[in-house]
Amino acid sequence: MAARLLAPLLLLLLLAPLPPPAAAAEPEEARCPRERLPPFVAAAAAAALRPSCRASAERCPAEEINGEELVKELSGKEECTAVLFYASWCPFSQRMRPVFDDLSSMFPRIKHLAVEQTNAMPAVLSRYGVRSFPSILIACGPYAYWPVGSKELDSLVNVYTAVTGQEPIAYLGPRKWSAARTGSTQHVKLWKSSIIEALKSEPYLAFSILFICLKILVAFFPKFFSCIKGIWVQYFRHANLGILAKLTQLLECVPHAVDLRKIWSKCRLMGGAMNSRVWASSLASMSFGERSSPRAAVLD
């Protein structure tokens, strides 16, 4: 009886599906922490596994600080720190900022800081060798490195790897920057504004346009002058200019024919007569006012 019952049980065990060997052999340490863990355990596990977990490409934007905080951050620290110096008015800085945020996400072990031009004194900028915007500084202990060359994501990743010896945890890829849209809006604002506002907002552009106009004038003025001289020699050299000479003689006789002193004296006399009439009317009104005031007082 027992043998009859064991036979179907053994058959069912043999036919049951087995787990795949890949899933059984998967190491637990390569997995990202789940939310079912306690909060403090999940936070500690995430911090420990973030460098090795390539599937967790989280966005980690750079921290905004000012110049004084930057000096405190870089003084006497051995950890690697990357600093972006940028200007909000610069279109190249607007393009560089999302790339720097991507680098912060790809290299979470490196602390990324961002300093805007207006938040740092010129002494701080000159101290860290900032000559233009955008500029990147990589500080590793007592040493500092300035990436020179292309500011594309691929070249900066190579610089990070060469300087710090760290590999990116994930490759996010270059972002698409709407340069055409930003440039078109800036051009529309520039054309809609007045000339004074355009000069205040874009002084370098105004000086460059003036320089180009002067260069064009210097380049084409000799040719233009030679053309005018040739036209004058060809068409107006043999023209009868006696009419112009007679006209100048007539204009010279006008001051002698018209006595300007008499006209000026008549104008002065007419102005004096008008002033005397005004004074007489004002004195009469004042006298009438003095006579009427006691009457008003008596009536009251």
From Swiss-Prot:
It comes from the Eukaryota. Residues 49-165 form the Thioredoxin domain. Keywords: Membrane, Signal, Transmembrane, Transmembrane helix. The chain crosses the membrane at residues 205-225. Residues 1-24 form the signal peptide. The keyword Membrane applies. GO terms for cellular component: membrane. It is a single-pass membrane protein. It is found in: Membrane. PROSITE patterns: THIOREDOXIN_2 (PS51352). InterPro entries: APRL5/7, Thioredoxin-like_sf, Thioredoxin_domain. This is 5'-adenylylsulfate reductase-like 6. It comes from Oryza sativa subsp. japonica (Rice). The lineage of its organism: Eukaryota, Viridiplantae, Streptophyta, Embryophyta, Tracheophyta. The gene is APRL6.
